[in-house]
Amino acid sequence: RLCFINKCDRTGADPFRVLQQVRDKLKLNAAAVHYPIGLEDQHDGVVCLVTHKAVTFSGKSGEIITIGDVPEHLRDQVAKKRKELVEAVSEVDDTLGEFFLREETPEVEDLRAAIRRATIARTFSPVFMGSAFKNRGVQLLLDGVVDYLPAPHEVENVALDLDNDEASVTLTADPKAPLVGLAFKLEEGAGLSQSPRSAFAIVHTRPAKGALRP
């Protein structure tokens, strides 16, 4: 699982207080993979603690993304939070734990791979930060889905065979097999114009087997 602390642009935003609540109330081994660049009306972006790069968002919808060095005034805090991240993952990943014991700094790919292993094993939850309304940090959250969550062929999905007394069937991620998926959201009347003739339903589907083709 991934966590996203939203509304870092709101008055009173305190993402690390929320992170502590995630640990205390949900009992998760969680640590931030982001450090906010400013809060409330000063929130401009985040520092990625994995890549050690500052990512800022501008434009009307956060569509202009700038990647640069960590601001000097944040370097001490960023170093501290990155160390916390490495410690949290090291507790549940032996490979990264060796870096920690040797007091070595892991490379970006080493840390990213360790976070992925621990996330898939459900022993660690990476915590992202941003503002969904202003589209800041959402792009990095989607990158996190790719980087840290399992691909379809890496998990076991089970369906019910309706023609065989609802017997359980294990699905394999074979694109040539008959389509099986989960329709998890329906938007009725989601036409591209206001004309009744153009109204149709959009079905959001998560395929587990096979492929959906027009």
Name each model-derived stretch.
Residues 1-214:
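Structural and coupling elements of P-loop NTPases
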